[in-house]
A protein has these predicted regions:
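Conserved donor nucleotide-binding strand/loop of the catalytic core
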Residues: 37-40, 51-85
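Acidic helix N-cap motif at the loop->helix transition within catalytic regions
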Residues: 17-21, 48-56
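N-proximal low-complexity "stem/linker" segments adjacent to membrane-targeting elements
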Residues: 1-28
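A conserved acidic beta->alpha catalytic loop
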Residues: 43-51, 98
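Catalytic donor-sugar/metal-binding loop of nucleotide-sugar-dependent glycosyltransferases
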Residues: 154, 180, 189-205
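Cell-envelope/extracellular polymer assembly enzymes that use nucleotide-activated donors
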Residues: 5-7, 38, 187
Length: 238
């Protein structure tokens, strides 16, 4: 029997409420796109029963897999681990709160089919439909402006948790990604652009989900990470 064509990864950390919705919704949408998919839940040291929920699904559906960690690795490191474990030629991931409208999933996967190395949703491109508080909107636009200014990126929105990769392209890049947490999304887009990646960014409909685990300290850490990555690229040549 042929292996999966598409791997979807959902990173989770104490997100039981959102995961209870995300798993059946993911199966529903993916089943319309391909019958050759797998769903990996990258469970990052949760203590709220996420692992137990996924194990229940595993017993009923062989396409669902739990990738458990006894301790918290960080979102970026959990995604790296899941990508290495994936069986599909196309690897997607999205946030467990399903903030990005899942009707965009065929477009995300289709972009890789059509030759893109990376595809990413955007809340900031013309044509996007994003609803969030004024403070978060200002912070996001400011952050992405700084990434473009300091790191030379051409992407509108680096932090949208709705991305896909050509596995053959992305695997050799992963060892150069140093961020273990939220900056992972930005670093992978910046570094792959410097490698000449074909990136498809497209506008999405996005609504802030419940129970996001991004904290204020994460925002400050991402700001300092911009400067750290600038130093690595331009000074230490790492």
């Amino acid at each position: 029997m042929a292996g999966p064509e598409v791997t979807v990864v959902i990173p989770v950390y104490n997100d039981l409420y959102s995961l209870e919705i995300a798993i059946p919704r993911s199966i529903e949408i993916l089943s319309r796109i391909t019958d050759r998919f797998e769903l990996i839940i990258a469970e990052d040291g949760s203590t709220d029963g996420c692992a137990e929920l996924v194990r229940q699904y595993e017993q009923r559906d062989t396409r669902i897999h739990l990738l458990h960690s006894d301790e918290r690795l960080g979102r970026g490191k959990a995604l790296n681990r899941a990508i290495y474990e994936s069986g599909g030629n196309i690897i997607c991931y999205y946030d467990v709160d399903l903030a990005t409208d899942m009707q965009h999933l065929p477009e995300l996967i289709g972009a890789i089919h059509e030759g893109a190395d990376i595809a990413t949703g955007s809340r900031l491109m013309p044509g996007s439909d994003s609803v969030r508080t004024g403070g978060r909107e200002i912070a996001s636009r400011s952050y992405n402006f700084l990434v473009r200014l300091f790191l030379g990126s051409r992407i509108y929105d680096h932090q949208c948790g709705f991305k896909a990769f050509n596995k053959e392209y992305i695997l050799p890049i992963l060892p150069s990604i140093h961020s273990n947490h939220w900056f992972w999304d930005t670093e992978i887009l910046v570094r792959t652009q410097r490698h000449g990646a074909r990136i498809c960014e497209f506008p999405v409909r996005w609504r802030a989900g419940k129970g996001t685990t991004v904290k204020i300290k994460d925002v400050f850490e991402m700001g300092s990470s911009i400067l750290r990555l600038w130093w690595q690229i331009h000074v230490s040549k790492n």
